[in-house]
Amino acid sequence: MAKIEWTDITRNPVKGKCPNACPYCYAIEIYNNNKWDPSIRFRPEVLDDLPRKPCRVFVGSTMELLLFPEWLPAIFDRCRQHPEHTFIFLTKLPRELPKWSPFPENCEVGVTVTDREAAHQAFFYIPLFRAKVKFLSLEPLLDDVTQYLYFWNLVRAVDGIIIGGMTGRKGKLMQLQKEHFPQMRLEKLDAVGRKWTLLPRLEWVKRIIEEADAAGIPVFLKDNLYKLAMERPVEDHDLYWEDMSTLRQELPRRSCGDQGVTTLKAVVTSSSDHPKARVTSGGGD
């Protein structure tokens, strides 16, 4: 599985093929290709197999964990037992989040928003739960959701925004584009064409970044948006780029903990500062 840029490691305490079966799900394809056991089973001990050095741990990268409420208390207990680490949860079921509020202090909680319907759900439920860091993952971004960020002020209810395209096999993406997403563009990510992505429209991404900057909210652009960001007008360079060759990949300051996060390039100061202000994280491996 490709590296997820905004985390250090992944851990999956619930094994098996995710029942959500989203059409763009990379995890189901991995299970099918490797002929892994699709049965659902609980393996909480994976959350004890962690590095000594504080790091960011994405919990449930291949599974919708909120489908299994009977196992969540044990998962959160494991998180509390490792306060040196930051545990990241991401869900497409925001309606379930208030049931588990408040979340442990070392947990970040995100909601996946791919289209307007998902944005509507996020708008309603994100204010109803408590977490040290809340964020939106607009990945894959399949529609223009700016009206929810602006008119409904959703952007000010979170501490960070991730934006990305849909990466996968060319054949599968071509079919999805034809049947569901004709407004998106198919591009190869590498010279030999092994990796492809469906790119959102540049104007969608630009409006989201502008709304986030106006609110002082950090923006993390996934690497699969590199080609899209190359097409921006010269005057919009700073919207997309950290420097001449590095995409903006920012995290909220408080997501770094006392030790800081060494594997990510930068974090953003609080919204009381200039919205584009950045501070470099500490040294280390």
Where are these regions (language model features)?
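Active-site-proximal loop/turn and secondary-structure-junction residues that shape catalytic pockets
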Residues: 63-65, 93-95, 113-115, 140-142, ...
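Conserved Radical SAM active-site core
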Residues: 1-108, 116-130, 146-155, 179-195
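A structural motif corresponding to the C-terminal end of an alpha-helix
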Residues: 78-85, 128-132, 204-218
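Auxiliary Fe-S-binding modules of radical SAM enzymes
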Residues: 1-10, 146-285
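Hydrophobic faces of well-ordered beta-strands that scaffold small-molecule active sites
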Residues: 57-59, 87-89, 107-111, 134-138, ...
